[in-house]
From Swiss-Prot:
Family to which the UniProt record says this protein belongs: Belongs to the acetyltransferase family. OlsB subfamily.
Name of the protein this chain belongs to: L-ornithine N(alpha)-acyltransferase
Keywords: Acyltransferase, Lipid biosynthesis, Lipid metabolism, Transferase
Enzyme Commission identifier(s): 2.3.2.30
Native species: Agrobacterium fabrum (strain C58 / ATCC 33970) (Agrobacterium tumefaciens (strain C58))
Pathway of action: Lipid metabolism
Coiled coil stretches, renumbered: none
A biological process from GO: lipid metabolic process
Catalytic activity of the protein: a (3R)-hydroxyacyl-[ACP] + L-ornithine = a lyso-ornithine lipid + holo-[ACP] + H(+)
Pfam families: Acetyltransf_5 (PF13444)
Phenotypic effect of disruption: Deletion mutant is unable to produce ornithine lipids. Mutant promotes earlier tumor formation on the plant host.
Amino acid sequence: MVAEIFNHDICENNVVISPRSETAQDNEGLFGRIGTLETRLARNEREIDAAQSVRYRVFVEEMKARLPAEAMRRKRDFDAWDSVCDHLLVLDKSIEGDSEDQIVGTYRLLRQETALANNGFYSASEFDIAGLVARHPGKRFMELGRSCVLPEYRTKRTVELLWQGNWAYAVKHRMDAMIGCASFPGVQPEAHALALSFLHHNCLAKGEWEAVALPELYHEMDLVPVEALNTRKALNAMPPLIKGYMRLGAMFGSGAVVDHAFNTTDVLVVLPVSSIAGRYISYYGGEAERING
């Protein structure tokens, strides 16, 4: 399940500024900076705990998710995958306090080799990921998940930094494909008939990239005949994050899954790096390679 974050079109004059020459600790693992915002991976357990607090504020307090009792008591969104994932952060350095107080956005990143050595991919609890990965023995997958940004930071620059970090991470670890669950609000797929049908008819992952919702969780996405689809209305009904993935060149798995705990209807994003639109590679790729050497 992924919270919807503000999407944007790339603007040529909005440049991601590379890290300034400050202290070695400040710049350790830094993927990029725009103004007072910067992106990097969490460096310690305190920062991961703070990211879990941000997730709780978005998923529970805002989106009305129902987490296990211990998570609700601690006011943290956490699960078994947190201990093996890398946690991408966006921090606002203008906020006074420690780094934990400055976290305003986060993404959870899981590499294939780490997933296979531990709990598998989170999205495999909803979709047949094993079959997808097995058809690509020479490719390396990474999972994106638990994306969220605090309401007051849902701006172009915050999302640019999150994608800057995602791309830099993918380049650093030589990833070939990105996967992950993206969400529609609510637990009634029929309420999103236009958008789900558009994904089914226009962006369905097929052939070697096919991935299907688990049989016991499968909900049909083909709810409106292709000849009856109004493209404009379908796109207007699409959550921003999903439209963002579409612009990058993503495909989507077959079937939606209702996640009652998070009060969402999930679809599977399948994004081969080779399919990412060229202008995005140019925009994010050059900067990522330059920062990471």
